[in-house]
Amino acid sequence: MRDRRSSYEYEDLLACGRGELFGAGNAQLPLPPMLMFDRITTITEDGGEFGKGHVRAELDVNPDLWFFACHFKNDPVMPGCLGLDAMWQMVGFFLGWVGGEGPGRALGLGELKFTGQVLPNISKVVYNVDIKRVMRSKLWLGIADGWLSADDEIIYRAKDLKVGLFKQTAQPVAG
């Protein structure tokens, strides 16, 4: 049975990262430190700009976040690729939430624009993705537009974020 709530707290996101939310072998979020949000505040199957689904998530920013120490020394800024990855994570989560099977992978995007930075003095990052299309076949494909705001100012815009869910083909690596 899939968990179909309309919001998720941090512990729920960790459960998703362990493969416990959508079933073994299905969509998972990465675990920390690559999990790029603290909560999903809203998820719907029919909302958003295109009426095909919507996800909103938040990250509480503080100067102790791992990436500020290394990117860059004496000039800390959240790498733009991490904000982009958060939006891909949200599209993959949505696909698992609506019933898609198999592990997820980011497949690309059409366009990305940065007009600001996430710095240590920012309090909160809000991520938003609006689903444009979900293709349901052997490969589940989600396409969405998204944005990131830092303290209520939109500073990233992404168009045509693409994430696919694939039937498991790779063998697990023995540890």
Swiss-Prot record:
Active site: 71
Secretion signal span: none
Catalyzed chemical reaction(s): a (3R)-hydroxyacyl-[ACP] = a (2E)-enoyl-[ACP] + H2O; (3R)-hydroxydecanoyl-[ACP] = (2E)-decenoyl-[ACP] + H2O; (2E)-decenoyl-[ACP] = (3Z)-decenoyl-[ACP]
InterPro entries: FabA, FabA_FabZ, HotDog_dom_sf
Keyword vocabulary terms for this entry: Cytoplasm, Fatty acid biosynthesis, Fatty acid metabolism, Isomerase, Lipid biosynthesis, Lipid metabolism, Lyase
GO BP annotations listed: unsaturated fatty acid biosynthetic process
E.C. number: 4.2.1.59, 5.3.3.14
Pfam families, A to Z: FabA
Keyword Mitochondrion: no
Pathway: Lipid metabolism; fatty acid biosynthesis
Domain of life: Bacteria
Cellular component aspect of the GO annotation: cytoplasm
Location of this chain's protein in the cell: Cytoplasm
GO molecular function: (3R)-hydroxyacyl-[acyl-carrier-protein] dehydratase activity; trans-2-decenoyl-acyl-carrier-protein isomerase activity
Record-linked SUPFAM superfamilies: Thioesterase/thiol ester dehydrase-isomerase
PANTHER family xref list: 3-HYDROXYACYL-[ACYL-CARRIER-PROTEIN] DEHYDRATASE, 3-HYDROXYDECANOYL-[ACYL-CARRIER-PROTEIN] DEHYDRATASE
Function (record text): Necessary for the introduction of cis unsaturation into fatty acids. Catalyzes the dehydration of (3R)-3-hydroxydecanoyl-ACP to E-(2)-decenoyl-ACP and then its isomerization to Z-(3)-decenoyl-ACP. Can catalyze the dehydratase reaction for beta-hydroxyacyl-ACPs with saturated chain lengths up to 16:0, being most active on intermediate chain length.
Subunit: Homodimer.
Family named by the database record: Belongs to the thioester dehydratase family. FabA subfamily.
Name of this chain's protein: 3-hydroxydecanoyl-[acyl-carrier-protein] dehydratase
Designated gene of the protein: fabA
